[in-house]
Regions:
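Intrinsically disordered, low-complexity acidic/polar segments
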Residues: 95, 142, 366-370
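Acidic, low-complexity glycine/serine/threonine-rich segments
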Residues: 281-343
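A glycine- and small-residue-enriched flexible loop/hinge signal that marks low-structured segments
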Residues: 2-53, 77, 107-298, 337, ...
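N-terminal assembly/attachment segments of tailed bacteriophage virion structural proteins
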Residues: 42-91
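Acidic/glycine-enriched edge-of-secondary-structure segments
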Residues: 80-115
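C-terminal edge-of-domain segments
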Residues: 345-386
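Catalytic cores of large soluble enzymes that bind and process phosphate-bearing ligands
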Residues: 61-65, 111-114, 140, 280, ...
Length: 386
């Protein structure tokens, strides 16, 4: 040991770290707005709207609601004035060119990401991680959704998309094209407060954001049975009756398509994702898994490249357990447990720089079907003699 004379201080870096759930409701919307102020919404660039309706209005400087973004974003804001990111793309000479611009890609000369691909730059530009994704007015196009879903998988985001068509059969046919657990499909379109048709996904996205930011609900709750604002009705009549498995709303839900019903106001109606694995059939369960996994991976950044010592293992496990316990207390899970399995962490694996942590969890069940049974009895007839 080198010679020292005096008092020398140091800081012990061991110990449990807090785990915090980041914003679960930050959305990115890709779309067109040819009359937008280009100084505020430059084409191909992610732009943050921090709950500012005045900035949102600059998507439509001419006031004619041209493009897919103005009405779509207005319907989102009818549900919740929120921080949200918009990526404006140029309209093409025809629909095919517009769709190509929306799908985007990487400019081979500049390396600039464009269209849907630019979603990957959102966190670097805005400082906020995307959690919810959609494409205004074009999510019913198979090519667009095919490009969007891999981005959602990479970022662990939920996708809001619409079914095309004017019939139940057309909507279901589109649904059959997909088997992704992070996808929720909607049908039909909604008539907004100006009696203009707007994709249902706009209203659903706004409801999801509003629900996520309400401490009584949060990311583990379903948007189903939530009233929507700024709407006059649906493009086509969607009949609904409690207990009727043959009404259109039930048939849509049975095919994992969320709709809107009239039941003391217009309400979102449907809980299910498009997952091909029944384990992930509920949208809320997918979101709990994604949000908790993100909380843990973000919360363990301090542990990267540390020496794997006993205190390291203890601190990592306890930090994660504390984070899980916090989400349980908040009502987002029934229970959860973290552990380090010695069998997965043999000496040769640790020396090679690997450490494996496991955790389990149980998300809340969703009361999708409430069963009420009546019992006819004579037992109370003797009340006439009391």
């Amino acid at each position: 040991m080198a010679f020292k004379h005096g008092i020398f201080g140091s800081t012990d870096e061991s110990g449990v770290r807090p785990m915090l759930m980041a914003d679960t409701s930050f959305a990115v919307v890709v779309g067109t707005a040819p009359d937008a102020d280009p100084s505020v919404f430059p084409a191909k660039k992610p732009v943050l709207i921090a709950g500012n309706p005045h900035k949102l209005a600059k998507l439509d400087m001419a006031g004619n609601k041209a493009g897919s973004l103005p009405n779509f974003m207005a319907s989102v804001y009818d549900q919740k004035r929120c921080s949200i990111c918009v990526i404006r793309v140029e309209e093409g000479a025809d629909e095919a060119e517009t769709i190509a611009n929306i799908i985007g890609g990487v400019d081979p000369a500049t390396g600039e990401k464009q269209g849907i691909e630019a979603i990957l730059d959102v966190q670097a530009i805005t400082g906020k991680r995307p959690r919810l994704l959609t494409v205004a007015g074009y999510s019913h196009k198979q090519a667009v959704l095919t490009a969007l879903l891999p981005i959602a998988t990479r970022l662990r985001c939920k996708v809001f998309a619409d079914c095309p068509g004017s019939t139940y059969e057309e909507a279901v046919a589109y649904r059959q094209l997909w088997g992704d657990r992070r996808l929720e499909l909607f049908w039909p379109r909604i008539r907004n407060k100006f009696d203009e048709l707007v994709p249902m996904s706009a209203f659903a996205l706004g409801v999801e954001i509003q629900k996520d930011q309400d401490p009584n609900y949060g990311y583990s709750a379903s948007i189903s049975n939530t009233r929507i604002n700024g709407a006059l009705g649906t493009e086509f009549t969607i009949d609904y009756a409690d207990g009727d498995t043959n009404c259109l709303s039930h048939l849509l839900n049975e095919n994992q398509i969320t709709t809107v019903i009239m039941d003391q106001g217009l309400r979102m109606w449907g809980n299910l994702s498009c997952s091909d694995d029944p384990k992930w059939q509920f949208n809320s369960h997918v979101r709990v898994n994604d949000m908790v996994l993100d909380m843990i991976t973000i919360g363990l950044k301090w542990a990267r490249d540390r020496k794997i010592l006993r205190t390291f293992v203890e601190d990592v496990v306890e930090s994660v357990q504390n984070g899980l316990d916090g989400e349980v207390r908040a009502g987002h899970m029934y229970g959860a447990k973290a552990w380090a399995d010695p069998d997965l962490n043999p000496p040769e694996s640790i020396i090679a720089g690997n450490f494996y942590l496991d955790y389990d969890f149980t998300p809340p069940g969703i009361a999708q079907a409430i069963h009420v049974t009546s019992h006819f009895t004579n037992d109370y007839a003797d009340v006439i003699f009391k």
